Swiss-Prot record:
Organism: Pan paniscus
Molecular functions per Gene Ontology: bitter taste receptor activity; G protein-coupled receptor activity
Family recorded in the similarity comment: Belongs to the G-protein coupled receptor T2R family.
Encoding gene per record: TAS2R4
Full protein name: Taste receptor type 2 member 4
Transmembrane segments: 10-30, 47-67, 82-102, 132-152, 173-193, 231-251, 263-283
Membrane topology: Multi-pass membrane protein
Subcellular location: Membrane; Cell projection, Cilium membrane
Chief site of localization: membrane
A single GO BP: respiratory gaseous exchange by respiratory system
Keyword terms of this UniProt record: Cell membrane, Cell projection, Cilium, G-protein coupled receptor, Glycoprotein, Membrane, Receptor, Sensory transduction, Taste, Transducer, Transmembrane, Transmembrane helix
Length: 299
């Protein structure tokens, strides 16, 4: 029964990856067409374009790795497995930093705080987006290189695993992976929670101000607050289980866990990227309108 559940989780994982690939390809193509047509692109769309490309490559790599792992009857070289792991770590870290940068941009642009720091960020963050995107890539490259450096002290075994024989031995490399993940994800988590909290606080102040002035509080600014807040909250709901599941998958005792636990970890690990990509399309006016036209929902 548990084997059937695990097999179903693998099938669901493949389906979710296909959905994620299609969604991110859609995000990339729409923003690319807008960029080419108007010869300009907004700061948020520039981040979404970078995020779409990164997630498309990451999910494609994950899908290829899953298919290869399930279908291969031969032993897998440690170098090929290490290549998959390192590429996935770099792309995953880059995509998470891009989302963090997107949340920071929404927080700075939408909130109405009058603090000098916020006013300075409002004026200067948009022109700095290309450099900040490059910084995200460099940070991801640094954490990946840190993993490589630390893993040199505990090299991988020569061969990883056969389809029906031994399991992959990652006990020696677990410390380096945990350090890399914690260094990258903890700062991202703090920034995203802070951005969401500031946005919620700003929305509450805005509603109180509208009520005090005896005017309707549902206006374009309120709608922008709510839309960005929903996207951030849903991101955190998907991101927290994803981070835990991803970390558990690399723990030494993961290979000895029951099929049910492995299935749950697999589902949570693959649900985040496709789910958040769908949420981006739903909450982004241009992407939502284009998607409706494609699906023939527009009358």
């Amino acid at each position: 029964m548990l084997r059937l559940f695990y097999f179903s989780a693998i099938i669901a994982s493949v389906i979710l990856n296909f959905v994620g690939i299609i969604m991110n390809l859609f995000i990339t193509v729409v923003n690319c067409k807008t960029w080419v047509k108007s010869h300009r692109i907004s700061s948020s769309d520039r981040i979404l374009f970078s995020l779409g490309i990164t997630r498309f490559l990451m999910l494609g790599l994950f899908l290829v790795n899953t298919i290869y792992f399930v279908s291969s009857n031969t032993e897998r070289s440690v170098y090929l497995s290490a290549f998959f792991v390192l590429c996935f770590m770099f792309l995953d870290s880059s995509s998470l930093w891009f989302v963090t940068l997107l949340n920071i941009l929404y927080c700075v642009k939408i909130t109405n705080f009058q603090h000098s720091v916020f006013l300075l960020l409002k004026r200067n963050i948009s022109p700095k987006i290309p450099r900040l995107l490059l910084a995200c890539v460099l940070i991801s490259a640094f954490t990946t290189c840190l993993y490589i450096t630390l893993s040199q002290a505990s090299p991988f075994p020569e061969l990883v695993t056969t389809r029906n024989n031994t399991s992959f031995n990652i006990n020696e490399g677990i410390l380096s992976l945990v350090v890399s993940l914690v260094l990258s994800s903890s700062l991202q988590f703090i920034i995203n929670v802070t951005s969401a909290s500031l946005l919620i606080h700003s929305l509450r102040r805005h509603i109180q101000k509208m009520q005090k002035n005896a005017t309707g509080f549902w206006n374009p600014q309120t709608e922008a607050h709510v839309g960005a807040m929903k996207l951030m909250v849903y991101f955190l709901i998907l991101y927290i289980p994803y981070s835990v599941a991803t970390l558990v998958q690399y723990l030494p005792f993961y290979a000895g866990m029951d099929m049910g636990t492995k299935s749950i970890c697999l589902i949570f690990a693959t649900l985040y990227s496709p789910g958040h990509s769908v949420l981006i399309i739903i909450t982004h006016p241009k992407l939502k309108t284009t998607a409706k036209k494609i699906l023939c929902f527009k009358k």
